[in-house]
Amino acid sequence: MVEKHLLEFLEKLQFLIAKNVKISHYGIENVKKICGVDIAYKGNLGFSVGVSMDINSGDYNYKSYVGEVNFPYIPGFLFMREAPLMIKAIEGLDCHLLLVDGHGIAHPRKSGIAAVIGVLLDFPTIGVAKSRLTGDLVNESEITYVYLNGEKVGVKFGRYFYSPGNKVDLQDCIELGKRGYPKVLKIADMLTKKTKKE
């Protein structure tokens, strides 16, 4: 159980982070090294893995971080559970763009975990999520957009939702989504499960 005053405080924090999100075209076709970060749980332990992958060769290296998670799962406040561990898992990894398992600005306060991490690290991030948290789906020119209060905040490809976190734009998300679910996140997901079993 989380006190109402704490959630109200966290909402204000999210609105502040959202104001600091920079939406600008990155050009993912220029990315040479891409990072992905994911997390798995066993009890109150979180197992986070950050993966840095060379786009051309597919070679990768990774880093893991295990820590206790005491904040409960509350939709819209995922960053309180996962961001601290994810940030530790990607420290020191070499990459130009970070993909986060979660939402960017396709979030009720435009401050999903990919936006939070992107702003805190001042780094280009894209959120890739498995389910829609907010907004309406609208098909335009063979692309399914996520609209929030009349604004395009994300896109859907297959069963996945892509949204800007920081220092990227919707076009970058479209270019990423067209390629299929990112391999670097598949690897991160596999390694979190492996780390959890060890």
Swiss-Prot record:
Hydrolase recorded as keyword: yes
Q: What class of enzyme is it?
A: hydrolase
Question: What's the superkingdom here?
Answer: Archaea
What are the names of the required cofactors? Mg(2+)
GO CC field: cytoplasm
Q: What is its main location?
A: cytoplasm
One Gene Ontology term from the biological process aspect of the record:
DNA repair
The record's subcellular location field reads:
Cytoplasm
This protein's UniProt keywords? Cytoplasm, DNA damage, DNA repair, Endonuclease, Hydrolase, Magnesium, Metal-binding, Nuclease
Q: Where does Mg(2+) bind?
A: 38, 101
Q: Pfam families this protein is in?
A: Endonuclease_5
**Which residues are listed under the site Interaction with target DNA?**
73
InterPro entries the UniProt entry points to:
Endonuclease-V
Residues spanning the membrane: none
UniProt feature coiled coil, ranges: none
Family assignment from sequence similarity? Belongs to the endonuclease V family.
Tell me the protein's name.
Endonuclease V
Q: Which organism is it from?
A: Saccharolobus islandicus (strain M.16.27)
The major lineage groups are: Archaea, Thermoproteota, Thermoprotei, Sulfolobales, Sulfolobaceae
